[in-house]
Each structure stands twice: as C-alpha cells, then as structure tokens.
Amino acid sequence: MKFSALLSQCGLRLILISVVSLMGFLVGPSFAHAQTAPSENESDTGIQVDKPSKLRNLVPAEQLERAADKQFNQMKREAAQKNALARDDHPELIRLRTIAQRLMPHAARWNPASSRWAWEVQLFGSNAINAFCMPGGKIGFYLGILEKLKLTDNEVAMIMGHEMAHALREHSRERLAKNQLTGIGAGLLSSILGLGDLGRTVMDYGAQLTMLKFSRDDESEADLIGLDIAARGGFDPRAGVTLWRKMSSASNKTPPQWLSTHPSGTDRI
C-alpha cells in the first residue's frame, strides 16, 4: 500500500473518530446534563432540576420567539378561515384565560425572561386531544381535550402548567440546537463512510432515538414544574393523578413507551 493511500486512510479514520466523539460529546447526556444542579430559584421552589444545556445558546431566544409568534398567528388565521377559532366570548376560552391568569404570575420564578412575554391563550375547534405553549408564551388548547376528557379546572391547570413549563425551560430551543448538531454530524459521517442517502436516513433514525431520551426527560421535568406552577396558582396538584388516568384511558393505541416522546400515563401517576 502506498504511503499516500495509507495516510489518506488514517486521515479518514481520524476524522471518523473525531466526528463520532464530537457527536457523543455534544448531544450525549454527559454534556447536555453535565452540571446537574438546582435551578437558580431552588430556594424559592424547593424543586431541584438540571441546569439547561448550554447548547440552547446556538438558537437565539428572540429569533425563536419571533418564529413562534409568526406560526401562532398563522394557526389563528387558518382556524378563523375554517370558523374553528373560538370567539373571545366562548365559555371554554374564558375559562382557559381565567386559569392562565392565575398561573402566569408564577412563571418568572422559572424563567425571568417570561415577565416580558406577550402571553396569549387561544382555543382551536379541533377534536384532537392536545394542547401546547410555544416559546414566548403562546398557549393553544384544542376543544377535543376539554370535551373528550371532561376536564375540571384543576386538570386544565395541570395541563397548562405542564405546557408552560416546556416554554419556560426552553425545551424547544434546546431540542432545535441538538437536532441541528446531530444533523450536521450525521451528514458528515455519512459522507465519510460513502453511505449516501441510505446512510443518512439510518443516521437520522439513530439521531431521533438519541433525541427521544432528552425529550422524555423534558416531559418529566415539565410535569414537575407544571405541578409547582399550578399549585402556586391555587389549584389542587392531586388533579394530576385523575388527569393522567383520563389520558391513559383515552389512549387506546399508543406507540411503545420506549419510542414515545411522552412517558405513559401510568408512569406519570
């Protein structure tokens, strides 16, 4: 074997090792949760959570909030065109906003920046059992989750607190940053190995499974912080048990827990 060929092969091995090491370092638990420490406000909450990953700084918060605001407005426009956006006098929307008003004052202890957010609550006329809170405090509930589960105010507060916690802890921002890094690493590794599109697809699947662990951790953290926010708003945290029992009963067909981004209802109980 010629020296140049040997050198080239060694170089490829070195690059390959570097890429694999870099991906493991950047998206692995050892870095993402390198500093397992109390939140800045543990003295106020008594709840210990991991410090947010520094990777989130790769995605500017302001840019993400602007994108979320744009997406939320688009959702409202599309829903309004289908007559599926609740009017301000809709009883369920009034109920949601009343509950939100009791929770919002307790958000800043988990993210001081939320004090400047333009919080907004909307109700969409969909049968889906779902709710969300986008970065920047854009809260959306689907009518299906209220009607199909027959939620009490306490149970609504549990869901709303949970979704608010995702935004407050910047889970979307962190996951986007990690997805960008795994995408870059997967593409580079596939090119080095000469696997082409097939290799990229396989690597992407692996990247998704890597991300699921973080997502499941995010869900558990949101459960804990959501309970804190709801309880401080004067709602009964025991409603979390009845809520997840309802969720479990409503989920007739769910993916295996290991491949799910949400822990099962029974695990949450």
Region locations from a protein language model:
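A Zn2+-metalloprotease active-site environment signal
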Residues: K2-I269
